[in-house]
Design a protein with these regions (language model features):
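N-terminal module of bacterial RNA polymerase sigma factors
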Residues: 1-34, 118, 182, 189, ...
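Short, charged helix-capping/linker segments at alpha-helix termini
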Residues: 1-3, 15-26, 37-55, 166
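Internal acidic/polar
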Residues: 2-6, 96-123, 154, 196-203
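Helix-turn-helix DNA-binding module
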Residues: 7, 132-168, 182
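Sigma70-family region 2
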Residues: 17-18, 44, 55-71, 92-94
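Amphipathic, Lys/Arg- and hydrophobic-enriched alpha-helical face
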Residues: 28-46, 63, 134, 186
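Structural recognition of an alpha-helix C-terminal capping motif at a helix-to-coil junction
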Residues: 51-58, 72-84
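Arg/Lys-rich amphipathic alpha helix in sigma70-family domain 2
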Residues: 62-66, 80-101, 123, 175, ...
Length: 203
């Protein structure tokens, strides 16, 4: 017997269309975390991330035909829906939302070696500065950082998500890294480099 957890997204979608609720639950559990994380990194707000995540999967349930497997895998489609929903939320509030004061900081904490509280504090402060710097980026730069650096999405899938050329993703990411280095330098928090290695600590 093949359990739904072992099936690919396309087969799980086929089963879901046929009325298999468990198949949809597997899809949700597989993609909910990354979609929530992306929405949180884009908005800085846990409440927005919760709303966006719910809206993404409600949209998928309402109309499965919106996803065309011939145009790519399910993940870029879901990220694309999340991207549009985040933009709508931010347009409604008309300002960039800072991290909620009651955010669960444990969800962002890097894993550090025990026995070095000063080093841990310095690292936390640096990552906090990096996180805040990401939130100040223009949305078209912030989204490529979230997709390519934080979610480690390929340039091709990021291009499908955003709806632009791969070259545009590369140039935006390069520009975003330059802006982040400048912002961190201005805050006296310049890392040795900004890229996937430093970003992994935020996920």
């Amino acid at each position: 017997m093949i359990y739904p957890q072992m099936l690919g997204d396309e087969e799980l979608l086929r089963l879901t269309r046929a009325g298999d609720e468990h198949a949809f639950t597997v899809l949700y559990r597989r993609h909910q975390g990354p979609i929530y994380r992306f929405a949180l990194q884009m908005s800085g707000s846990e409440s927005v991330a919760d709303d966006v995540t719910q809206e993404v999967f409600l949209a998928l349930m309402r109309d499965f035909s919106q996803f065309d497997s011939a145009r790519g895998s399910l993940a870029p489609y879901l990220y694309g829906v999340a991207r549009n929903q985040v933009r709508r939320h931010l347009e409604r509030v008309k300002f960039q939302v800072p991290l909620d004061e009651d955010s669960d900081e444990d969800s962002f904490e890097p894993i550090t070696a025990p026995g070095d509280p000063l080093g841990d504090l310095t690292l936390r402060e640096g990552l906090s500065a990096l996180r805040q710097a990401i939130l100040t980026l223009p949305l078209h730069y912030r989204e490529v950082v979230a997709l390519c650096d934080l979610e480690e999405m390929s340039y091709e899938d990021a291009a499908r998500t955003v709806g632009c050329a791969v070259g545009t993703i590369r140039s935006r990411l390069h520009r975003a890294h330059g802006l982040l280095v400048q912002k961190l330098r201005d805050a006296n928090q310049t890392p040795s480099g900004v890229g996937r290695n430093s970003m992994r600590c935020l996920t």
